[in-house]
Amino acid sequence: MKIIQSFWSGNNDCLKDGYGWLSPIYHYASWILSCNQLRKYYDDVILVTDRAGYDVLIDNLHLPYTNVIVCLDELSKYSSNLWALAKIKAYNALDEPFIHVDGDVFAWDKFDGCLGEHDLIVQNIETTTDYYRMMWNEIRPSINVLPEAMEDYDQNVSHKAYNMGIFGGNDILFIKDYCKQALEFVDLNLEQVNKLQGINFNIFFEQVLLHELATRNDKDVATYIKEDIGDNEYQGFADFDNVPEDRKYLHLLGFYKKIPTVCNKMLAYVIKYYPEYIMRLEKLLSLAPIITELGQDTTHNKMRTEMLSYKESVLKGELETSSKDRNIMFRDIVSKLLSCMKEKSQSEVLMMNLLPKRELIMS
């Protein structure tokens, strides 16, 4: 099974924009973790990106993708707020069964077994509550051309969507038709929707539209997570304390990206398991080293304030922990790692030499 991921710079400064995260360091730590975890379980993991994304994720961070397709520069006419267009382009890029995985999804096991012979696979089905309905009511005046498939949702008859933290399937013809209709939905209303600020139109031309089309066409849709979850009720999807024993799948969607504790637990995990990538990230963002000897003074800038606060709390024993001993031990291990990672510099060079060669496809 081919796995794909997509990153679009959105005409923004890749080194300064947090892309929904508290800061760039967390954003790229997420990519480090997501890609490397996927490579543990899959031999073919493809990145779809633009030239700026290639420069950061491949040339600088050396993420271990097996192939890279550079085609998202063609999205330059769109507002960066329409970030799901990059996913739509990625879905349309392959002509064989695939699963797309968001860059804020982390897996500790394979998940393609759920697809089987089903037409499609998604993370889970959502019930759209007043949260989505209020957003749609704000967006609706900007929509001059409404796809026929969206009429039931528009009239408040349908109240479902798909969460597409993962999405793909075997029915490539349907997926390509869905991508065509999603792009048309945006393009036929582009002048208005390009101006939308602070309203998430992506939910509707990606998640709601897919559900409506799949329902109309009677598609057999597999769900990785079997629960029907309310659109603003995602609980436990950032539980780093319980991976990999009790949780095999995390998705730091939406609000999770703005919670310092969640971001810092993710960063601590990356420091522990992928230190060579953190060293590259420090260099890329011109940060003072995160991985230092205990007690050594470090300089820091605004971008690193939350991370350093977490590290200092751990080292001083001031951080509140759960009652589970292994959580305390995990943080203790991370703290101790800070004292020895300088020794990793030579192994980092070795790792870079061992990185697999990639096929670069430019379009």
Where do the PLM segments sit?
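Conserved donor-nucleotide/metal-binding helix-loop-beta segment in metal-dependent transferases, i.e.
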Residues: 109-139
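N-terminal anchoring/stem segment of glycosyltransferases
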Residues: 1-75, 256-262, 274-285, 289-295, ...
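Short, flexible, basic/aromatic active-site loop/helix in glycosyltransferases
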Residues: 144-157
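Short, solvent-exposed loop/turn segments at secondary-structure junctions
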Residues: 9-12, 52-55, 74-75, 105-107, ...
